[in-house]
Amino acid sequence: MKNTADITVLGAGSYGTALAISLASNGHRTLLWGHDPEHIENLKRDRANEAFLPGITLPDLLVPEADLATALAASNNVLVVVPSHVFGLVLEQAKPLLREDSRIVWATKGLEPETGRLLQEVAREVLGDKYPLAVLSGPTFAKELAAGMPTAISVAGTDESFTQDLVELLHSSNRLRVYANDDFTGLQLGGAVKNVIAISAGMSDGIGFGANARTALITRGLVELTRLGEAIGAQASTFMGMAGLGDLVLTCTDNQSRNRRFGLALGKGQGVEEAQVEIGQVVEGYRNTKEVYTLAKRLGVEMPITEQVYKVLYQGGTPHEAAKSLLAREKKSETEDSE
């Protein structure tokens, strides 16, 4: 089937729209599908996503599309950018509409709710082994990407030619640098764990602790990410790159991060539900915490920071209790396998 678009993006939230804007600005005809027809009509009328990225004009090559069948028929390249808790559901909806030559990449950051499975496992369960798969991950705030500010990300997949095609599609000399990576597993994990650590950094700052504590959490958070990654077969070196250290530093230190702001609100004494309402958008780290905690427990991987965030979010603990517990841990060498 002939392409009428270079790529179709599923998910018209802030990040999906930002990626679609970047692709269209790079000269690629891009279809952007969203589950809410009214939202898509607003995009068509306003030529902007005023709900999530106000004030940023959609390029002419970006085409909002409310019909999923039309969107998936337009291109064999499909970029999924939806919250992790609906990732499987969207793939189920897309499955009967995919082309024979479809190739699936996602920028969703997270694991499967309840099970803690990687999204590649979810994709394989829904789609089988028929389609090439890839993941896009790295330190990106949607607003900056949409505004054309310099950004760098990584992409890895099951098919080398698909990975290289994605690099060519996404890379832009003046706005987006794309690095190919061969660690499909590692790139998926980094995007989930960094959200958990960002909540912890936000809680620390909300309590009133300083830069020393925040930096310690980032550093030890990287240790936790690497430890869990190695347990599932990822490469430790991946977590020193864009999808590990890069995403971790960005999300833990800048208030554009919803996860960091969520943690800040908790640290200042707000309850979990109250803090979520204040953010006003999906806080991926809330679900990611349970997902990562579940995976770590299943594998027997020690992740003290993640465990304390889990206790605050799901077991009624407080940020002060979490800090006290972490500080009271047994003294150990920095280079020991466990903290």
From Swiss-Prot:
InterPro entries: 6-PGluconate_DH-like_C_sf, 6PGD_dom2, G3P_DH_NAD-dep, G3P_DH_NAD-dep_C, G3P_DH_NAD-dep_N, NAD(P)-bd_dom_sf. One of its GO terms (cellular component) is cytosol. Its main location: cytoplasm. Pfam families: NAD_Gly3P_dh_C, NAD_Gly3P_dh_N. NADPH binds at S14, Y15, H35, K109, A142, R258, V282, E284. The active site is at K194 (proton acceptor). Its EC number is 1.1.1.94. GO terms for molecular function: glycerol-3-phosphate dehydrogenase [NAD(P)+] activity; NAD binding. It is found in: Cytoplasm. One of its GO terms (biological process) is carbohydrate metabolic process. Keywords: Cytoplasm, Lipid biosynthesis, Lipid metabolism, NAD, NADP, Nucleotide-binding, Oxidoreductase, Phospholipid biosynthesis, Phospholipid metabolism. Pathway: Membrane lipid metabolism; glycerophospholipid metabolism. It catalyses: sn-glycerol 3-phosphate + NAD(+) = dihydroxyacetone phosphate + NADH + H(+); sn-glycerol 3-phosphate + NADP(+) = dihydroxyacetone phosphate + NADPH + H(+). Sn-glycerol 3-phosphate binds at K109, G138, T140, K194, D247, S257, R258, N259. The keyword GTP-binding does not apply. Catalyzes the reduction of the glycolytic intermediate dihydroxyacetone phosphate (DHAP) to sn-glycerol 3-phosphate (G3P), the key precursor for phospholipid synthesis. Belongs to the NAD-dependent glycerol-3-phosphate dehydrogenase family. This is Glycerol-3-phosphate dehydrogenase [NAD(P)+]. It comes from Shewanella woodyi (strain ATCC 51908 / MS32). The gene is gpsA.
